């Protein structure tokens, strides 16, 4: 090849393709992180961010979000409860600690530095910082998967997989949630790389304990990112115990490393809650007959808990139906990548290389165990669910799917050595898989440019109201009850208790706060109360929700005020809540009602705020 066709060791075609790849990548990063970014979209992602800020302040692994169930656990365990230093045992610790390091570096531990004081700004700056962390982790994961798949197959399949990853709309959406999925993707990809090296050594009848240990370390870090991934790890432990040398010992060695990494946190969970699984263990019931939020909001979940535990038939039925639903939604949960589900067809193909043939069974076993874990602990219909682990398998399943398609493509009679023969199937797969992103790109760009920066995740969040109004109206020793305590804790930097379902539980938690010389400032009600279509259910809204009148005040006032505008009348806030006999003790304490935003966010307080 002449020098005119080579630049720095690369031929012109390769150089141009790589330049285009990085240009597209830069454009996508700008689009998702700057142009179309509205804020963090996941409640649990927001909660992990505020835990990270507390860690950055030197407050250890504490949270300003108080769950009734966590309070119940601590009380049952006979622990001293301090609402100003409430230990979090719900979230896995690694992601908040990473957020803490980044927030400390940018000064995010100082609330006033990033407080939203300008009316025109609706995106919280620290939301973008958290999202940027996820983007960086995602890009690292793309690179690791390129190296892994190049080792398993070849650079063409690795390159196509990398392109499909960056063109997956779901991958980018996860970077906007605040959830640890991109961290998990990076760690899982690293673990797979060393698992494959261990497998190669095993096939060649030589021991590679170092690769197995490194894989176990990455899997342990994965577990510290999300406890549910322990199910995935168990899948690998089963395979290693039977097929990796030394047999049996390999599996116990992996479990030993996992215990070494997680032991400290298990002991702390036991110390704070009386359960090594902490409050996260109670999320088990999200996969059974009760929703997780119902359990988490109650400060006495024992009755519901025991009912569910002994209902074995319900357990089996719900677990089975959840697994079947996961299979039905697998395509979207794998990032809507056309060839990813073809991994299961690749299981039927007799690959010539033994390592490729055996590695797919490791992946399958880990996926099956992960699917079982998701079924037991609960997975909603949203493909951005915090428990969504399918996305971790998307790159490796995509690679096997591409290999399978390449084998079929090679059997088509096309000119040998031509571009169509070499890259035609890759182009088809990429164009179809990128469809969701391509279709939304123009519309989202126009919307972002026309909104002039007035974008946020509404409903249910409107950060300026919390960051400026609510924060300035309250003090550091104030406690706020809310149906979205994670938003109050993150955007307003105030201790927030998840609004319980019963008045008696509210009064109990209120007494806990006052006994600690804290002041309950009021109650914040937002559209979050209606997130689950509560009016469209078999049980009437309010049947098991004492605060239903409080939640309905906003929509009621909005509807009636519009009807009375022409008559010069306005409906006073708190119309329904003040008529409720159950809520009378509470409304007497918090009589002042302030419409914070568009009849959708109300603040019930002791003292009057200005009326918006």
Regions found by a protein language model. Name each.
Residues 15-25, 209-217, 233-238, 255-259, ...:
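Signature aromatic-anchored transmembrane alpha helix within multi-pass, membrane-resident enzymes
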Residues 4, 199-201, 231-262, 266:
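Perimembrane helix-loop-helix junctions
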Residues 191-212, 222:
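Membrane-interface transmembrane helices that cradle and orient dolichyl/undecaprenyl
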Residues 414, 419-487, 521-524:
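Membrane-embedded, lumen/periplasm-facing catalytic core of multi-pass transferases
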Residues 18-21, 110-124, 140-167, 185-186, ...:
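Transmembrane-helix signature of polytopic, membrane-embedded enzymes
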Residues 140, 145, 241, 317-367, ...:
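Hydrophobic, aromatic-rich transmembrane alpha-helices
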Residues 175, 180-184, 189, 222, ...:
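Hydrophobic/aromatic-rich transmembrane helices and adjacent perimembrane loops
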Residues 26-27, 160-161, 165, 214-219, ...:
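Transmembrane alpha-helix segments characteristic
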